[in-house]
Regions:
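Helix-coil boundary/capping segments in enzymes
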Residues: 1-192
Length: 192
């Protein structure tokens, strides 16, 4: 409440796709993308436990499809959330998403931790099979803000690195402002 004041009650359209369609109609909006809120912290929280991370991503995507549909009536396009921490897994999950008429995928704005313990940019050559498949599919890539793993920058400057959604400390914000532009830069610079 300190950050936002009194909040409006949760609208049924936040949790029900038919109510969301009614809101879209009332607002004159043809269609929308839907992105995860709390889901954007999964990769950072679980990157050192690859089986748990991949299971969490898979479960999240199945839940989104069950609850909202990855493509509901060509009007609500829910993003499947993928990671390149395991390219073979990402290709399997992309294939599943495409089979469920997915039109947009979401990725974390960060490098990924490979099975060998080394970090790789999104544009790293090891990820080329995924980018080729995504390009062939012709669907949209979204890079969503969230816990990008930039806590090391905050630690370096003596700040509390714990990620807290909706809490904004000026120095912390300035030290971690660039994950999305960094991710896009890696894709451009490495030829994706």
């Amino acid at each position: 409440r300190a950050a936002f004041g009194e909040l409006d009650p949760i609208s049924p359209s936040y949790r029900n796709r038919d109510a969301r369609l009614a809101d879209l109609d009332a607002q004159g909006v043809e269609a929308c993308f839907m992105f995860p809120t709390l889901g954007v912290g999964m990769e950072s929280a679980l990157e050192n436990d690859r089986p748990a991370m991949l299971a969490a991503f898979r479960a999240f995507n199945r839940w989104v499809d069950d609850d909202w549909g990855l493509n509901h009536q060509n009007r609500i396009f829910s993003a499947a959330y993928l990671t390149l921490a395991d390219v073979d897994w990402a290709l399997e999950e992309l294939e599943w998403a495409l089979a469920h008429d997915c039109r947009v995928i979401n990725m974390r704005a960060s490098s990924v931790l490979g099975a060998d313990g080394q970090r790789r940019s999104l544009g790293h050559p090891d990820h080329e099979p995924f980018w080729a498949a995504l390009n062939e599919a012709g669907i949209t890539l979204a890079i969503h803000s969230g816990d990008a793993g930039y806590g090391f920058m905050v630690d370096y400057w003596g700040q509390n690195a714990e990620f807290e959604a909706f809490r904004h400390e000026p120095l912390k914000m300035l030290l971690t402002y660039s994950p999305i532009s960094d991710a896009v830069a890696s894709l451009i610079a490495e030829g994706v």
